[in-house]
């Protein structure tokens, strides 16, 4: 945006506003960066929700100032004075403004760090509002510029929605892990989940979910050049869940399907382009998460006698399954590193869901993350140097990974000796279950594919 304007303060606002009309609850997100040094330290940019376009209209905004001040500003009534709640974050460049009825929640961060939030309640702007991006130079004789990136407007799940019965739409996104830049390459009001990147880099494989028995549980190959999705022939296996994985060489596809065994998840393999599934796991439920780099074994989570643990089995089904973990509570998301020397997984054995690792036969189990998040589904980069994960806050049961939450995609270096390393946020996402359940790195290690969620606006 390019703008002048005296200020957004007191009883009279002057600014450039790129808006659209919205109703009900919604979330806005963006990365904001001022262009140039600027003239006035109080130049302002951010996200705004406004009752109308009059200069003295009631509003709420999430604002970043030129001097680094970050705050939630609001005017309660027409012609009233602007009030402010300061954020503890200085110089934020990631901002989010969420409306829940008459509550407005402002979350801010410096890219790489988690959000810090402040909120205000009982601000009555009416159901239909003007919402969007703004800039004011704080000087009517000066023109300033701001760049907004990763702009999202999200319609969250409705209050009281029932998981696995009620669904909202999906967006397939590609994340540049070096810059944090995100690109939406596919949208659908019907939900889909869990992209796998093909080793040749040309396509992604995902599954449909949702409540429609004629549409859910199918696997599709999404061509990145044409942006078209093609149904994969999986024979009788038409109730696939989100635990599907390509072999390292890309020739075979492992699936977790619920068409047999009274709806229990069973692992099958078939050619990557489609074919007749071959059953691999004799026991259920079994949820696939990884092939070994040499293609000889499959890693999966198995529910046996009320316990969910990590197992491996020959990928041709020629031998029995081998249990690799025995700790009480959920162990899930096992994945081989590209060199085959380690298996990373998530476990609740410490009280929170954390990332662990072990040897290829279950030996030397050690904790990798030591933080206050609930971390799920570790994915090693193709060069074995980085570990991606999805991180929930404290608003969930640590043994669960629910749909439709505020989550982070985080990245941490893999250390050879397992010593502690810090994870940084690379994406601020509304998603959760189905976002990155399975390996989704690009073959060159520069990007991660994931699914975010929004209902129709």
Please report, for each region that a protein language model flagged, where it lies by residue.
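Sequence signature of WD/YWTD-type beta-propeller architectures
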Residues: 158-457
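Extracellular glycan-recognition regions
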Residues: 1-161
């Amino acid at each position: 945006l390019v703008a002048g304007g005296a200020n957004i303060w007191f009883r009279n606002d002057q600014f450039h506003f790129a808006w659209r009309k919205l109703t009900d609850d919604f979330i806005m997100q963006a990365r904001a960066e001022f262009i140039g040094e600027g003239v006035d330290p109080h130049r302002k940019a951010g996200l705004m929700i406004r009752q109308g376009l009059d200069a003295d209209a009631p509003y709420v905004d999430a604002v970043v100032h030129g001097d680094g001040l970050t705050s939630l500003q609001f005017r309660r009534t027409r012609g009233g004075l602007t009030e402010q709640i300061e954020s503890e974050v200085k110089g934020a460049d990631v901002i989010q403004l969420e409306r829940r009825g008459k509550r407005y929640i402002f979350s801010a961060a410096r890219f790489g760090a988690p959000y810090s939030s402040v909120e205000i309640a009982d601000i009555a702007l009416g159901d239909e509002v003007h919402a969007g991006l703004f800039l004011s130079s704080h000087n009517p004789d000066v023109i300033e510029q701001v760049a907004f990136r990763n702009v999202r407007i999200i319609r969250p799940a409705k209050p009281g929605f029932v998981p696995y019965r009620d669904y909202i739409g999906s967006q397939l996104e590609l994340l540049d892990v070096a810059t944090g830049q995100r690109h939406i390459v596919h949208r659908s009001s019907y939900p889909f989940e869990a992209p796998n990147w093909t080793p040749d880099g040309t396509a992604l494989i995902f599954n449909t979910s949702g409540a429609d028995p004629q549409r859910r549980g199918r696997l599709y190959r999404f061509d990145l050049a044409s942006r078209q999705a093609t149904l994969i022939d999986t024979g009788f296996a038409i109730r696939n869940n989100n635990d599907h994985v390509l072999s390292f060489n890309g020739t075979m596809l492992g699936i977790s399907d619920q068409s047999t065994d009274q709806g229990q998840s069973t692992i099958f393999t078939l050619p990557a382009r489609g074919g007749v599934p071959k059953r691999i796991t004799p026991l259920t439920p079994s949820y696939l998460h990884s092939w070994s780099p040499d293609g000889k074994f499959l890693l999966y989570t198995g529910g046996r006698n009320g316990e969910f643990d990590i197992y491996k089995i020959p990928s041709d089904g020629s031998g029995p399954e081998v249990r690799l973990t025995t700790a009480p509570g959920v162990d899930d998301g096992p994945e081989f590193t590209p060199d085959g020397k380690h298996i990373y997984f998530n476990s609740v054995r410490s009280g929170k869901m954390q990332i662990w690792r072990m040897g290829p036969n279950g030996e030397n189990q050690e904790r990798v993350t030591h933080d206050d998040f609930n971390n799920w589904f570790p994915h090693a980069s193709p060069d074995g140097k980085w570990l991606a994960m999805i991180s929930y806050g404290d608003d969930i049961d640590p043994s669960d990974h629910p749909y439709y939450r505020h989550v982070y995609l985080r990245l941490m270096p893999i250390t050879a000796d397992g010593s502690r390393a810090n994870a940084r946020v690379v994406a601020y996402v509304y998603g959760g279950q189905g976002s990155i359940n399975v390996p989704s790195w690009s073959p060159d290690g520069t990007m991660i594919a994931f699914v975010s969620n929004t209902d129709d606006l």
